[in-house]
């Protein structure tokens, strides 16, 4: 027995566990793995990261882990040859993962969705190892749809998340990076009439080209008084930076542009308003810090999961869902002008966003992982989690 469960539902670990994390791909799959890894390391567990051969060299907590790389291939959105190649890579990766897990014999294997996790999770299921998958989005991705009914426990970020057939979800919330969670204690600094208005525009881990054209056009439509107040921080793709900078300079708008901000959590903390995509990690971080946002879902996401994510925050009053198809410079300028003129609306939205956050999501997920390794299920109080 590795763990025991006291009456309050918190898990007490008696012996270190060996836990394998299967993660890779975009930040939406990697950031919750990083958050969980930090909590598990704090508890004294041994971790191994299993990712795909094309994966990034990770920094932060994941960069400190013993890392194994296997083949993995996706099939969604690819042509016939691409799908065939993906299926071959999936089969070969599953064989590699099977041999790796037989050798490592972890106490539990945890997956975070995306094609990079599938070979390892299929191998773990075949070996009858305890397994957990965490679904970040309100609409599950194809990888977790495949796995949800087969794994030991299926954890979700949203209480109203779509439930795959045969799955029994456990709501834990969206684990956010420790660097973000550390700033949760710093409250929302409401903008003051006539003074600086800090606007953060970020397109997520893959950037958002539409923001490079639409946002500068919208800001140019604001009144001179509004433009003079703006302090813009914008993430752009490298090839877009010079054009965006020229537009802002022509309008006299103070702007800092970069393809990457290493201090993005601090910039998120300092923002009066955020314009962003609505990936699960982004929505989770907005809620953790309590920052109001205009949410523009990526319209080409499979199953349109970003719209479902954004709707959760919009419905509790923590942000404003603006679909890209209906978003024009005029519509965005009108919304921005209204918000800049009414800071009380932003304050209320910040409070609503914060109320939707689940700051202990990494702890909840770590409890579930530890309990699954010991064939127990922790008692988690129900909570309507919207972000």
Swiss-Prot record:
- Name the UniProt key words of this record, in alphabetical order: Cell cycle, Cell division, Cell inner membrane, Cell membrane, Cell shape, Cell wall biogenesis/degradation, Glycosyltransferase, Membrane, Peptidoglycan synthesis, Transferase
- The domain of life for this entry's organism is Bacteria
The reaction(s) catalysed by this protein are: di-trans,octa-cis-undecaprenyl diphospho-N-acetyl-alpha-D-muramoyl-L-alanyl-D-glutamyl-meso-2,6-diaminopimeloyl-D-alanyl-D-alanine + UDP-N-acetyl-alpha-D-glucosamine = di-trans,octa-cis-undecaprenyl diphospho-[N-acetyl-alpha-D-glucosaminyl-(1->4)]-N-acetyl-alpha-D-muramoyl-L-alanyl-D-glutamyl-meso-2,6-diaminopimeloyl-D-alanyl-D-alanine + UDP + H(+)
Q: A GO molecular function for this record?
A: UDP-N-acetyl-D-glucosamine:N-acetylmuramoyl-L-alanyl-D-glutamyl-meso-2,6-diaminopimelyl-D-alanyl-D-alanine-diphosphoundecaprenol 4-beta-N-acetylglucosaminlytransferase activity
Output the GO biological process annotations, alphabetical, semicolon-separated.
Answer: carbohydrate metabolic process; cell division; cell wall organization; lipid glycosylation; peptidoglycan biosynthetic process; regulation of cell shape
Q: Which residues bind UDP-N-acetyl-alpha-D-glucosamine?
A: 26-28, 137, 177, 205, 306
What's a single GO CC term here? plasma membrane
- Biochemical pathway: Cell wall biogenesis; peptidoglycan biosynthesis
List, alphabetically, the SUPFAM superfamilies matched.
UDP-Glycosyltransferase/glycogen phosphorylase
Q: What does this protein do?
A: Cell wall formation. Catalyzes the transfer of a GlcNAc subunit on undecaprenyl-pyrophosphoryl-MurNAc-pentapeptide (lipid intermediate I) to form undecaprenyl-pyrophosphoryl-MurNAc-(pentapeptide)GlcNAc (lipid intermediate II).
Q: Which Pfam families match?
A: Glyco_tran_28_C (PF04101), Glyco_transf_28 (PF03033)
Q: From the Swiss-Prot or TrEMBL record, give the protein name.
A: UDP-N-acetylglucosamine--N-acetylmuramyl-(pentapeptide) pyrophosphoryl-undecaprenol N-acetylglucosamine transferase
EC nos: 2.4.1.227
Membrane topology per the record? Peripheral membrane protein
Q: What family is it from?
A: Belongs to the glycosyltransferase 28 family. MurG subfamily.
């Amino acid at each position: 027995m590795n763990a025991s469960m006291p009456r309050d539902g918190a898990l007490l670990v008696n012996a270190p566990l060996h836990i394998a994390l299967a993660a890779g791909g975009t930040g939406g799959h990697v950031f919750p793995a990083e958050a969980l890894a930090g909590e598990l390391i704090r508890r004294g567990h041994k971790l191994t990261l299993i990712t795909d051969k094309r994966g990034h060299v990770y920094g932060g907590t994941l960069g400190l882990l013993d890392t194994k790389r296997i083949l993995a291939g996706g099939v969604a959105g690819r042509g016939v040859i691409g799908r065939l190649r993906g299926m071959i890579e999936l089969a070969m990766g599953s064989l590699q993962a099977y041999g790796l897990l037989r050798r490592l014999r972890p106490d539990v294997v945890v997956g975070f969705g995306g094609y990079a996790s599938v070979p390892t999770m299929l191998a773990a299921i075949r070996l009858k190892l305890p397994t957990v998958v965490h679904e970040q989005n309100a609409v599950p991705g194809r990888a977790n749809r495949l796995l949800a009914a087969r794994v030991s426990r299926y954890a979700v970020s949203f209480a109203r998340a779509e439930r795959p057939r045969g799955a029994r979800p456990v709501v834990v919330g969206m684990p956010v990076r420790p660097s973000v969670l550390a700033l949760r204690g710093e409250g929302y600094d409401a903008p003051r009439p006539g003074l600086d208005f800090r606007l953060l525009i970020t397109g997520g881990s893959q950037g958002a080209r539409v923001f490079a054209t639409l946002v500068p056009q919208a800001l140019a439509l604001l009144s001179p008084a509004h433009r003079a107040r703006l302090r813009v921080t914008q993430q752009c793709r490298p090839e877009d930076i010079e054009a965006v900078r020229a537009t802002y300079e022509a309008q006299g708008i103070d702007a800092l542009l970069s393809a990457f901000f290493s201090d993005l959590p601090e910039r998120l903390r300092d923002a009066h308003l955020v314009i962003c995509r609505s990936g699960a990690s982004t929505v989770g971080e907005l809620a953790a810090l309590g920052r109001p946002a205009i949410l523009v879902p990526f319209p080409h996401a499979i199953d349109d999961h970003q719209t479902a994510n954004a709707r959760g925050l919009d419905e509790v009053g923590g942000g404003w869902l603006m679909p890209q198809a209906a978003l024009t410079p005029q519509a965005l300028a009108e919304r921005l002008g209204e918000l800049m003129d009414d800071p009380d609306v932003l304050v209320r939205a910040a409070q609503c966003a914060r109320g939707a956050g689940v700051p202990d999501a990494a702890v909840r997920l770590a409890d579930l992982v530890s309990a699954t390794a010991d064939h127990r299920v922790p008692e988690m109080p129900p909570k309507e989690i919207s972000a």
